[in-house]
Amino acid sequence: MTLRIYDTAARKKRVFEPQDAKRVTLYVCGPTVYNYAHIGNARPPVVFDVLRRVLMARYGEDAIVYARNITDIEDKIIAASVASGEPISAITQKYAAIYNADVEALNVIAPTIEPWATGHVPEMIEIIEKLIRKKYAYVGDTGVWFSVPSMPDYGRLSGRKPEDNEAGARVAVDEDKRDPSDFALWKFAKPGEPEDAIWDSPWGRGRPGWHIECSAMAAKHLGRTIDIHGGGVDLTFPHHENEIAQSECAHGEELARYWMHNGFLDMGGEKMSKSLGNVVTVHDLLKAWPGEVLRFALLTAHYRAQLDWTEDLLKQAKTTLDRIYGALRRVWEADGGEARDTGVLRALEDDLGTPDALAELARLASEANTAADLKDAVAMANGRANLLAAGKLLGLLTKTPKEWEQGADTDENSRIDAQVQARVDARVAKDWAEADRIRKALAEEGVEIMDGPAGSTWRRI
């Protein structure tokens, strides 16, 4: 089956055909690192991680070059530095490390390349100089501006006109502009701004605009035309529209051949955002839930659809994963099976149809249970192989059944192991009262003991 993805620019699904099947390029806008990421911020890395896994299955792991940037200079970062008294680099390094650890806990594979904006200021200046020479940009009193009217087809990605811009979309009002829709390529430094937010340039000291950062990083690491550019739907306009304007006017080549955008997460019927104050951070969620539960929950809705984030969604995701891991446990020792071409890949090849892929994963778990009921060794081995292959595509089932059932607290697990062994010893000694006491005590802690031919094991319930 061919891979079909919804291209925002074309407003329809298109068959994906890379420029070079041996080097498939993917660029996704990464975090602005000044605070903890909320769970809505985690949707793009999870969605595009699934896309990356599908691409790896089709073209090979080494063929996929995936860049996800770090925005480490921006107005909110500067404000955080001024408020805290910490250097900008201390803030950005701290929160970039936390972000990467958080998304790693969601089974997101690290990007091939993680460019930081501040490491690419010379490349940004080079693009701006080219835009000025080609009359697409001009120097004003407060900065260097891109002239939106100079690009006749500006707005083709989003289908929006410059005057359609809405509040909060990061297009600043400034009397220095020739046109209200013009946007900043370079911002001149203001009195009192921290020195670590200022660079020299041919036009004066200052810092780059937000949009030019991605244009420079994508071109340097992936080339002037990339296969797929992704991000949240809120970036479609103006950020991605402005990236197109800068890059294509500077280089005279198409920036991206396919554009993909994921939908919002809602909480209480409103878009989740820091400005609305209705956010829950990934960092906090990971204290209460396994990362795989968060990932599963994020995949329950199609990536372009809005997803209502609730406690019930997390509970349902945990229950479903418990059942799937339970099936995997029953066939875990059955090695040597062959994974067949299941419906998981077919679902994902149709514009990342994760709801259908998860339904197929559940069906594979039922097959594995049936094979275990029948004690069919070949079917059990194949069931194990099918589950693990499907899990690899989705970024799920990355733990052993025992690890999943017992959690990750090693010290606590050792204590429970000792209690279970004490119960085994009590049963051998026919001290039934002690054995029953231990079982009840563990049950009160949410631990279930399972006795079988191979001995006694336990799981959290």
Swiss-Prot record:
GO CC, alphabetical: cytosol
The record's keywords, sorted A to Z, are: Aminoacyl-tRNA synthetase, ATP-binding, Cytoplasm, Ligase, Metal-binding, Nucleotide-binding, Protein biosynthesis, Zinc
Annotated ATP binding lies at 274
According to the UniProt entry, where does the motif 'HIGH' region sit in this chain? Answer: 31-41
Q: Which InterPro entries match?
A: Cys-tRNA-ligase, Cys-tRNA-synt_Ia_DALR, Cys-tRNA/MSH_ligase, CysS_C, Rossmann-like_a/b/a_fold, tRNA-synt_1_cat_dom, tRNAsynth_Ia_anticodon-bd
Q: Which compartment or compartments is the protein found in?
A: Cytoplasm
Which reaction is this enzyme known to catalyze?
A: tRNA(Cys) + L-cysteine + ATP = L-cysteinyl-tRNA(Cys) + AMP + diphosphate
Instruction: List, alphabetically, the Pfam families matched.
Output: CysS_C, DALR_2, tRNA-synt_1e
Cytoplasm found in the keyword field? yes
Coiled-coil residue windows? none
Residue positions of motif 'KMSKS' region: 271-275
Keyword Transcription carried by entry:
no
Q: What binding partners and quaternary form does the record give? A: Monomer.
What protein name applies here? Cysteine--tRNA ligase
Organism (species): Hyphomonas neptunium (strain ATCC 15444)
Which gene does this sequence derive from? cysS
